[in-house]
Amino acid sequence: MSNSKLVNYTKLSPNHSGKRTHSIDRITPHCVVGQCSVETLGNIFMNTACEASCNYGIGYDGRVLLCVDEGNRSWCSSSNANDQRAVTIECASDTTAPYMMNLSLIHISEPTRR
């Protein structure tokens, strides 16, 4: 399985379950509740105590982090069934409800071209 060519920064998290048990058929965006950079996102998901990760992170400036290889299941949505089949994307967002994130930064067609 290949990773996105849109990645600007790589910091691989130890927080994942290894190889997926289902093929990818969906995208799950999730807000990180903060205007984080990709460097900050990478550091957050390096901490094993947080028990969280994502395949990709999108920083406040639109740069893209590779955090967990697409071939592996990340720990993003609190659903094993979903995370096994989704490309998970943590997005920088506002810090107050409704936690707006700029979804125009996500290139939705990119994962479907593979």
Language model segments and positions:
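N-terminal catalytic cores of peptidoglycan-degrading enzymes
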Residues: 1-83
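A generic signature of intrinsically disordered, low-complexity regions enriched in glycine/proline
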Residues: 19-20, 94, 106
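Short, glycine/acidic-enriched loop or turn micro-motifs at the edges of active sites
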Residues: 33, 93, 113
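A generic structural motif
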Residues: 92-98
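Residue-level detector of conserved catalytic or cofactor/ligand-binding positions
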Residues: 106-114
